[in-house]
């Protein structure tokens, strides 16, 4: 009887351990987290100093994080108010970006894949974006076509935004980054 | 009642202990046991020791997640067992080109952009520590005054891959970016044995 109890305890522990591992990796948790407003990055994932959780994740998902000299990447799953991004709402991504040679903003599925849309636009590069006279920009993330910089959502039921800064002077190791260093994501109208 | 309660707590502690152990071990061995990691996916598309252009990132046709659709990407898988790998790039355009050197399990041990080029060229030799020692011993002291024209990188493991990225800032530059990453030469060398 005691042996069975011991075995059950071990089995329950193993199952729970695998469950926790899957959950942690799916949620991209790690000790190495940089945050600026809704944007989250893992600046050490492009070095040999990579966090063990990020290391396990890249083995599992096969993603190729940017090398530290290549640039930094950030993912936003929420808007600047903290609410999850909803596919039936419009969002305005606006503001400035730290000194960087190029940046790109891409719309991805929660697992990091591109989402098909009729306009065949999957993101913007800093060169493509139409800017205001003061150099700031506004990108509208919406399901239906908008004038100006429109990033289509397609038929996605959930999505995230990915911001990549290439050849950037921003260094999360030495600088504290405020919420307004990266673009704001403001919710507009909802269908 | 209290005895039963404490014995339940004990079993619960046992479950949590085993779960924690399994979690830590699973995280640590994941890079070694993952079968569908980046290297495995790239190895299905590319031959070792040569530059292979990866298919453009489009919905439903992505080799790896979190690819930037604005980039053309090429890969060179290497195995340094028989000798170093020489990576040579001519970058005449002012296009953003980044090169990352990764281990078999996908960690970046060195990365650079076209800004690190010397008169528009990049020359990198990846080698193991014994190979570097052999090259330095062969060179002796004779040309110590000459600045090195190449970057010598010691790779953590014999196996790994080099990823070359070029940005097409506008869709019209896609063909140019693809041609540029494809033109990066990646040549395995055999060390002269004496």
What kind of region is each of these model predictions?
Chain A
Residues 1-191:
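A compositional/structural signature for long, glycine/proline-rich flexible linkers
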């Amino acid at each position: 009887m005691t042996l069975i109890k011991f075995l059950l305890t071990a089995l329950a522990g193993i199952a729970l351990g695998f469950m926790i591992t899957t959950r942690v990796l799916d949620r991209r948790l790690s000790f190495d987290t940089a945050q600026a407003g809704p944007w989250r990055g893992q600046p050490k994932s492009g070095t040999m100093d990579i966090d063990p959780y990020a290391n396990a994740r890249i083995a599992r998902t096969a993603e190729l994080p940017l090398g530290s000299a290549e640039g930094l990447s950030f993912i936003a799953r929420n808007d600047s108010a903290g609410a999850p991004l909803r596919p039936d709402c419009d969002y305005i991504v606006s503001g400035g970006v730290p000194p960087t040679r190029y940046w790109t903003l891409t719309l991805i599925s929660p697992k990091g894949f591109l989402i098909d849309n009729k306009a065949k636009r999957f993101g913007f590069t800093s060169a493509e974006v139409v800017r205001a006279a003061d150099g700031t920009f506004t990108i509208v993330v919406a399901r239906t076509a908008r004038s100006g910089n429109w990033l289509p959502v397609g038929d996605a039921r959930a999505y995230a935004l990915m911001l990549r800064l290439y050849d950037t002077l921003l260094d999360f190791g030495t600088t504290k980054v405020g919420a307004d260093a990266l673009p704001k994501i403001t919710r507009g109208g909802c269908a | 009642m209290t005895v039963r309660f404490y014995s339940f707590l004990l079993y619960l502690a046992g479950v949590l202990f085993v779960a924690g152990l399994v979690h830590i071990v699973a995280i640590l061995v994941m890079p070694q046991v993952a079968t569908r990691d980046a290297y495995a996916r790239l190895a299905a598309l590319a031959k070792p020791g040569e530059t292979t252009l990866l298919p453009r990132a489009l919905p439903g046709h992505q080799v790896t997640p979190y690819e930037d659709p604005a980039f053309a990407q090429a890969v060179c898988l290497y195995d340094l067992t028989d000798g170093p790998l020489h990576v040579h790039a001519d970058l005449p355009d002012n296009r953003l080109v980044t090169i990352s050197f990764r281990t078999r399990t996908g960690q970046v041990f060195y990365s650079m952009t076209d800004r690190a080029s010397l008169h528009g060229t990049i020359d990198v030799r990846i080698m193991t520590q014994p190979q570097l020692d052999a090259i330095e011993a062969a060179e002796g002291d004779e040309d110590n005054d000459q600045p090195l024209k190449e970057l010598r990188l010691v790779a953590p493991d014999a196996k790994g891959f080099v990823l070359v990225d070029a940005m097409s800032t506008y869709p019209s530059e896609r063909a140019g970016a693809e041609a540029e990453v494809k033109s990066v030469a990646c040549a395995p060398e055999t060390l002269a044995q004496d």
